[in-house]
Curated annotation (Swiss-Prot):
Keywords: ATP-binding, Cytoplasm, DNA damage, DNA recombination, DNA repair, DNA-binding, Nucleotide-binding, SOS response
Similarity-based family: Belongs to the RecA family.
Species of the source: Clostridium botulinum (strain Alaska E43 / Type E3)
Summary of the function given for this chain in its UniProt record: Can catalyze the hydrolysis of ATP in the presence of single-stranded DNA, the ATP-dependent uptake of single-stranded DNA by duplex DNA, and the ATP-dependent hybridization of homologous single-stranded DNAs. It interacts with LexA causing its activation and leading to its autocatalytic cleavage.
Name of the molecule in the record: Protein RecA
Major subcellular location class: cytoplasm
UniProt: ATP binding residues: G68, P69, E70, S71, S72, G73, K74, T75
Gene: recA
PANTHER family: MITOCHONDRIAL DNA REPAIR PROTEIN RECA HOMOLOG-RELATED, RECA
GO MF annotation: an example: single-stranded DNA binding
């Protein structure tokens, strides 16, 4: 690169100094300086998805959109992120615009519902104002809005059935995101917007699918995740879960268009052991010979379900395999697996008290 004139450099430094005095430290910087740090992330609770995102989870200080058809696992993924944030000592806010949050299911996924901040707003404006107030406090690590489609503008709620309200929701989202984007970045909070799919009428070529709430969220989101249910997991005659595929359709912090596949088990959430088996085989850390799965000299079991069960019963083996995979992808290592739901913790506390 050509050398910049010394007088120009001095002028730039003086200008930057004045800007920092006026607007605060970090308001302007050179990209090559140490002040631009690596992007921190919070794990999604799914090893394959953490790898697909490139930085080991969803980026802090950014907006994330999770969208897909009904019952594909969007809220489950958001709740897993909430649980991971709480494990690190973070605070989580949940704007339940759909009025459909199931606390017992959230507890099963590892969410500390006692300390989860929940709001069930009456209007879209109220929901987004509450979200902004929580983010502005600087104490919230993750804010989840479930869902954009349920953020109904006040005019629509107060109006009559059949009234036309074209573009109201899109305008509301555009205005809210303009206000939120800067605050989210400054407070290093992750804003997760869950969104639904709609069909565009009269589309001949390309995908007729679109998300609700206009185009603003597509632009402001640093990460967009397309969640699809691709198969059902059967045990005997009953269905016990879904096979889910996520495509990273937009990623501003790592290469996009990567995919992750995993099991979501009913009342349990993402199957960690199933994910370790799948990724382990893909990375050749777990060997598959016929129907048998093995890790070094350890035989995990015949068939995937038996291998999953072995890892459930032997968490230290699962941890060892997971850390090898994480090391290979330069992701932070796991210290220990503590998978106790708040119900189990409460049960233990009650037992201890009764023993006393």
């Amino acid at each position: 690169m050509a050398n910049i004139d010394i007088n120009k450099l001095k002028a730039i430094e003086n200008a930057m100094g004045q800007i920092e005095k006026q607007f605060g430290k970090g308001s302007v910087m050179k990209l090559g300086e140490d002040s631009v740090l690596n992007i921190d992330a919070i794990s999604t609770g799914c090893l394959d998805l953490d790898i697909a995102l490139g930085i080991g989870g969803v980026p802090k200080g950014r907006i994330v959109e999770i969208y897909g058809p009904e019952s594909s696992g969007k809220t489950t993924i958001a709740l897993h992120i909430a649980a991971e944030a709480q494990k690190k000592g973070g605070a989580v806010g949940f704007i339940d615009a759909e009025h459909a949050l199931d606390p017992s299911y959230a507890r099963n996924l590892g969410v500390d519902t006692e300390n989860l901040i929940v709001s069930q707003p009456d209007t879209g404006e109220q929901g987004l104002e509450i979200a902004e107030a929580l983010v502005r406090s600087g104490a919230i690590d993750v804010i989840i809005v479930d869902s954009v489609a349920a953020l109904v503008p006040k005019a629509e709620i107060e109006g009559e059935m059949g009234d036309s309200h074209i573009g109201l929701q899109a305008r509301l989202m555009s205005q809210a995101l303009r206000k939120l984007a800067g605050t989210i970045s400054k407070t290093n909070c992750i804003a997760i917007f869950i969104n639904q799919l709609r069909e565009k009428v009269g589309v001949m070529f390309g995908s007729p699918e679109t998300t609700t709430g206009g185009r603003a969220l597509k632009f402001y989101a640093s990460v967009r995740l397309d969640v699809r249910r691709i198969d059902s997991i059967k045990q005997g005659d009953g269905i016990v879960g879904n096979r889910t595929r996520i495509k990273v359709t937009k990623n501003k912090v790592a290469p996009p268009f990567k995919q992750a596949e995993f099991d979501i088990m009913y009342n349990e959430g993402i199957s960690r052991e199933g994910n370790i088996v799948d990724v382990g085989v893909k990375e050749e850390i777990v060997q598959k010979s016929g129907a048998w799965f093995s890790y070094g000299d350890i035989r995990l079991g015949q068939g995937r379900e038996n291998a999953k069960q072995y890892l459930k019963e032997n968490p230290e083996v699962a941890l060892d395999i997971e850390n090898q995979i994480r090391e290979k992808h330069n992701l932070p290592l796991m210290d220990a697996v503590i998978k106790e739901t708040s119900q189990e913790v409460k049960g233990k506390e009650n037992k201890e008290q009764s023993d006393k």
